[in-house]
Curated annotation (Swiss-Prot):
Its EC number is 1.3.1.14. Heterotetramer of 2 PyrK and 2 PyrD type B subunits. Belongs to the dihydroorotate dehydrogenase family. Type 1 subfamily. Its cofactor is FMN. The keyword Cytoplasm applies. This is Dihydroorotate dehydrogenase B (NAD(+)), catalytic subunit. PANTHER family: DIHYDROOROTATE DEHYDROGENASE (FUMARATE), DIHYDROOROTATE DEHYDROGENASE (QUINONE), MITOCHONDRIAL-RELATED. Catalyzes the conversion of dihydroorotate to orotate with NAD(+) as electron acceptor. Gene3D superfamilies: Aldolase class I. The active site is at residue 120. InterPro entries: Aldolase_TIM, DHO_dehydrogenase, DHOD_1B, DHODH_Type1, Dihydroorotate_DH_1, Dihydroorotate_DH_1_2, Dihydroorotate_DH_cat, Dihydroorotate_DH_CS. It comes from Saccharolobus solfataricus (strain ATCC 35092 / DSM 1617 / JCM 11322 / P2) (Sulfolobus solfataricus). FMN binds at residues 17, 42-43, 117, 152, 177, 203, 229-230, 251-252. Substrate binds at residues 42, 67-71, 117, 178-179.
Amino acid sequence: MITIKNITLNDPLIIASGIIPDVPNYVETICEKYKPSAITTKTVTLNPLEPHKPPTVIKLHDGIYMNAIGLGNPGAKAINEIGVLCPLIVSVGGSSINEIKEVVEVVQSKAKIIEINVSSPNRKGYGESLSKLIGDIIESVKSVTKLPVFVKLGPWDNVIELAGKALEKGADGLTLINTIKGLIIDVETFKPILYYGTGGVSGRCLYPIALRIIKDVYEEYGVDIIGVGGVYDWTDVIGMLAAGAKLVGLGTVLIEKGFSVIEEIRKGLQSYLLEKGLKFEDIIGISVRK
């Protein structure tokens, strides 16, 4: 069992944002059939947002993708149509502080945790563009909700500084990390393959970067962290817990292997804990304490 902000979950395995479309029946089916400890929704904005034109996703190598969907979503009200069969972490976004606050007001009745996305690299005016306003965003959101508020940050050089600003203004935790902005050129046309141009690189290559940032931030602040980035098997989960994460988001691995991999990873974790005589709580942050 894992407790995060008075929410008790069976284990640390959650589904990361961007994997499951905000289609109520689909979310409910995944909850019921595969039993993740929680699902993070795709980032929702106040009003529907059209995705970028295709191509929006390309596979670079096994376990490595690049996407520029551009936060396309059906709007915040769609969240309220989801029948909650497992805890929802609702990812919220917007092009202004006020929009983000309004989204939180709309979705909070369905959420266990609010995750503010200020790190998407794939839409001008959204996500990463607002990271410099993180303190003001947190203050605004905390004025309208009593739910735990986490902030999703990117793999930036100033991530520790931004994490500190978010926590200083009342953030309850952090989600680390979002994708890394990348570019692939078509050698026939000499143009970017993705319609948007750049895209967020995700998958296995992200894991050591995510692990380093999680450890650095946990060492600095000792805060609750949802670790995301390149997790592919149970050993990766243990690594993230050891670095300081309390929950671990599965993303690209679900695209590559399907949702049944959740149970495969879960069994690996259970066998490891049994063999070592440990609980999840014993492992969280252990690499920082050594």
